[in-house]
C-alpha cells in the first residue's frame, strides 16, 4: 500500500509528515524549513506558495493569507483576474506540500490524513476534504488537531493509563481537548474552543498599538495604507516571536510613509511587559474553554496527568504562565508545538495502512445535531462530545391529518429553539399515505462518519420510502457562528427555557384538543351525556384560550379539560369493563352447567399486554 502523508493545514503555517518505520518524520520544504507559510500569491499568472509568497506579501497585492479562516463559507477571494473559493486556495497549499513530499519519498502520493481544529463544523470539514480532492489527494481521514497531537505524544506510552489535556493555540484557532489514553486506545472525552482566537489576534494587538503610537506622533493613520499595513503585520509577528525569548525588542520600519516634510520612519521598542498588557484579554479568553472541556469530561484538574501545548502561539510566555495557573501543572515540552499535529496525522495514516498496530482513535463531534419539531423546537438526536463515528435514529410522526409530506430541517447547535441554531440542510419526504395525524411512523437517522461529516435519512416505516441528504459545505457554519452559538446558549439559557416551556404548552393544548374531540365523537349515543357536555364545554373554553394566546389562561383551561376528559374516559372504561364482566359471567354459567362437579379454579386471568 502506498504511503499516506499526514498534513497539518494551518491558518498561518502548514506542515507535512510521513511514517518511516515506526517513527513519524517531518518533511522539510525545498527551502529547508520544517513548516511552510500558508500563503499563496500570484505573479504574471504564476502561482507562488509558501516562503516565497510570504516574502513578497508586502509588495504584491495579489497575496492571500489566512485562507483557513474562510473555509466552510461561500466567501471568495479575488486574485489573478478571477475569483477563487477558499477550497481552491487551500488546494494550492496542499498541492505544494504534496509535491515536495513526493520529491522526498521518490514516489507518487495519492492519499493523506488532514487535520482540522476540533471545533471545525460539518461545512468546514467538508470544505477541507474538497480542498484535498482538488489537490489530487484522497483524504483518508479528517482528524482533530488536538487528537493528532495526543497521538504523536502518546504513541510510545500505550501501556500507560493517562488523562491528558491538549491546549492548542494556533495562528487562527484555539482548541482544548481532554483525552484518555490506555491500552492503545486514544479516547477523546471532551473538546471546547474559540474559533476566533489565535496568533493573528496577538499580532493585531501590536499592529493597533503601532498605528496608534505613530498617529499620536505624526498625525498619519497607517491603517489606511495597504502596503504600510502589511509591513506592520510582518513587524508585529516578528516582535511577538522575539519576545518569547527576550524581554524587549526593537521595531524599525524605515520609510513607512511620507509626510509633508518628506519620508517618515517608524522606530520604537516593545517590552514583554507592554506586550503582555496589550494581549491580556486574549490570554484571559483561553481560560473559559479549558474549564468547559474539564466540565464536559466530568473531570477535576487533579485527575489530569499531563498538559500538552500545541501550536506556535503556545510559545508566548504569558500563555504558558496562564496554562500553569489554570491547570496547576507544568506543561509537557517533549513535543514540538509546530510539528506535533502533522506527526500525529502521519501516525493515523500508519494506523490506516496497518503499519501502526494496536492503536484505536476515538474522536468526538463538537456540536449537537438534530431536527426541528412541532412548534419550532430543536430536538437533539446526537449530543455534542459524542464519540464518532456514530448513528442515531428516532421515530417522529405527522402534525396534521392526511399530511402528504414532511419537511426535515437539519440543525447544528446548542440552543433549545430551532431558529437560534444553524441550518445544515433541508429536505422533504413525500408520498406519505393519507392517515390521521400521529399515525405515520417517520424514522429519522443521523449518521456521522469518522471525519465528522453528517448525513441524514428519513424513512416512512409504512411504505419503506426513504430520502437521504449529505450535508454540503456551503450550508455549514462559520467560525464566528459556532463561537456565538455556544456563548448565546449560556447567555440566553433562561429565556430559552421560557420559550421552550411556551411551545411545549401549546403543543400539549393542541394534543388535548385533538384527543378530546376524538373521545367525544366515540362516546356519542352511549348514554353519558352529562360527562360529554362537561367535556365539550371545557373544550370550547380551551379553544378560546388558545385563540387569545394567553398562556396562563391556556394552562388553567387545559387542567380543567383534562379533568373533564378524564371523567368521560372513565365512564367509557367502566361501561366496557361492565360489558366484559357480563360476558364473562355468561360464559361461566355455561361452563358450570356443562361441568357442575368442577368446583376449583381461580378468578385471576393471566394476560399479555403489548406496549405501543
UniProtKB/Swiss-Prot annotation:
Alphabetical keyword list: ATP-binding, Chaperone, Nucleotide-binding, Phosphoprotein, Stress response
Modified residues (Phosphothreonine): 173
Gene Ontology molecular function terms on file: ATP binding; ATP-dependent protein folding chaperone; unfolded protein binding
Keyword GTP-binding: no
Cystine pairs: none
Gene3D superfamilies for the chain: 1.20.1270.10, 3.30.420.40, Actin, Chain A, domain 4, Substrate Binding Domain Of DNAk, Chain A, domain 1
InterPro entries per UniProt: ATPase_NBD, Chaperone_DnaK, Heat_shock_70_CS, HSP70_C_sf, HSP70_peptide-bd_sf, Hsp_70_fam
Region (Disordered): 576-612
Annotated Pfam families: HSP70 (PF00012)
Bias kind Low complexity: ranges: 576-594
Acidic residues bias (residue ranges): 603-612
Induction: By heat shock.
Keyword match Mitochondrion: no
Function: Acts as a chaperone.
HAMAP family with a match to the protein in the record: DnaK
Family to which this protein belongs: Belongs to the heat shock protein 70 family.
Record protein name field: Chaperone protein DnaK
UniProt source species: Streptococcus mutans serotype c (strain ATCC 700610 / UA159)
Gene of this entry: dnaK
Amino acid at each position: 500500500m502506498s504511503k499516506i502523508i499526514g498534513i497539518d493545514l494551518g491558518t498561518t503555517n502548514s506542515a507535512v509528515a510521513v511514517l518511516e518505520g515506526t517513527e513519524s518524520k517531518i518533511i522539510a520544504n525545498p527551502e529547508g524549513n520544517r513548516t511552510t507559510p500558508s500563503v499563496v500569491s500570484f505573479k504574471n499568472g504564476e502561482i507562488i506558495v509558501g516562503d516565497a509568497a510570504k516574502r513578497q506579501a508586502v509588495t504584491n497585492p495579489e497575496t492571500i493569507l489566512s485562507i483557513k479562516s474562510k473555509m466552510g463559507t461561500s466567501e471568495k477571494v479575488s486574485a489573478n483576474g478571477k475569483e477563487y473559493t477558499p477550497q481552491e486556495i487551500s488546494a494550492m497549499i496542499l498541492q505544494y506540500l504534496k509535491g515536495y513530499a513526493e520529491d522526498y519519498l521518490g514516489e507518487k502520493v495519492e492519499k493523506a490524513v488532514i487535520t482540522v481544529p476540533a471545533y471545525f463544523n460539518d461545512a468546514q470539514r467538508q470544505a477541507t476534504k474538497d480542498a484535498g480532492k482538488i489537490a489530487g489527494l484522497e483524504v483518508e481521514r479528517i482528524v482533530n488537531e488536538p487528537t493528532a497531537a495526543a497521538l504523536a505524544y502518546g504513541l510510545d506510552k500505550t501501556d500507560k493509563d493517562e488523562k491528558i489535556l491538549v491546549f492548542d493555540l494556533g495562528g487562527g484557532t484555539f482548541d482544548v481537548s481532554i483525552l484518555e489514553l490506555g491500552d492503545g486506545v486514544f479516547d477523546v472525552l471532551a473538546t471546547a474552543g474559540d474559533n476566533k482566537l489565535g496568533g493573528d489576534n496577538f499580532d493585531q494587538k501590536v499592529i493597533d498599538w503601532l498605528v496608534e503610537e505613530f498617529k499620536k506622533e505624526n498625525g498619519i493613520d497607517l491603517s489606511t495604507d495597504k502596503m504600510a499595513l502589511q509591513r506592520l503585520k510582518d513587524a508585529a509577528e516578528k516582535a511577538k516571536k522575539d519576545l518569547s525569548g527576550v524581554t524587549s525588542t526593537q521595531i524599525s520600519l524605515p520609510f513607512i510613509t511620507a509626510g509633508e516634510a518628506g519620508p517618515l520612519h517608524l522606530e520604537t521598542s516593545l517590552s514583554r511587559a507592554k506586550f503582555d498588557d496589550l494581549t491580556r484579554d486574549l490570554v484571559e479568553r483561553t481560560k473559559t474553554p479549558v474549564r468547559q472541556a474539564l466540565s464536559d469530561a466530568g473531570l477535576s484538574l487533579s485527575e489530569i496527568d499531563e498538559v500538552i501545548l500545541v501550536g506556535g502561539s503556545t510559545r508566548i510566555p504569558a500563555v504558558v504562565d496562564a496554562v500553569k495557573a489554570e491547570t496547576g501543572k507544568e506543561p509537557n515540552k517533549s513535543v514540538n508545538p509546530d510539528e506535533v499535529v502533522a506527526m500525529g496525522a502521519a501516525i493515523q495514516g500508519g494506523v490506516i495502512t496497518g503499519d501502526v498496530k494496536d492503536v484505536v482513535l476515538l474522536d468526538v463531534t463538537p456540536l449537537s445535531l438534530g431536527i426541528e419539531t412541532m412548534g419550532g423546537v430543536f430536538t437533539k438526536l446526537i449530543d455534542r462530545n459524542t464519540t464518532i463515528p456514530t448513528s442515531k435514529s428516532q421515530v417522529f410522526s405527522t402534525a396534521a391529518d392526511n399530511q402528504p409530506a414532511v419537511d426535515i430541517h437539519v440543525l447544528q447547535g446548542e440552543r433549545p429553539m430551532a431558529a437560534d441554531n444553524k441550518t445544515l440542510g433541508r429536505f422533504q419526504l413525500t408520498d406519505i399515505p393519507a392517515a390521521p395525524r400521529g399515525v405515520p411512523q417517520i424514522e429519522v437517522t443521523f449518521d456521522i462518519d469518522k471525519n465528522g461529516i453528517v448525513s441524514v435519512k428519513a424513512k416512512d416505516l409504512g411504505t419503506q420510502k426513504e430520502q437521504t441528504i449529505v450535508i454540503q459545505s456551503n450550508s455549514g457554519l462559520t467560525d464566528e457562528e459556532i463561537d456565538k452559538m455556544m456563548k448565546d446558549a449560556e447567555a440566553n439559557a433562561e429565556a430559552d427555557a421560557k420559550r421552550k416551556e411556551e411551545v411545549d404548552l401549546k403543543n400539549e393544548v393542541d394534543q388535548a384538543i385533538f384527543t378530546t374531540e376524538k373521545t367525544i365523537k366515540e362516546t356519542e349515543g352511549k348514554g353519558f351525556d352529562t360527562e360529554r357536555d362537561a367535556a365539550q364545554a371545557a373544550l370550547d373554553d380551551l379553544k378560546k384560550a388558545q385563540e387569545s394566546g394567553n398562556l396562563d389562561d391556556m394552562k388553567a383551561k387545559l387542567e380543567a379539560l383534562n379533568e373533564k376528559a378524564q371523567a368521560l374516559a372513565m365512564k367509557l372504561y367502566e361501561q366496557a369493563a361492565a360489558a366484559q364482566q357480563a360476558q364473562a359471567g355468561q360464559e361461566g354459567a355455561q361452563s358450570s352447567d356443562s361441568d357442575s362437579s368442577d368446583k376449583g379454579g381461580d378468578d385471576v386471568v393471566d394476560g399479555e399486554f403489548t406496549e405501543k
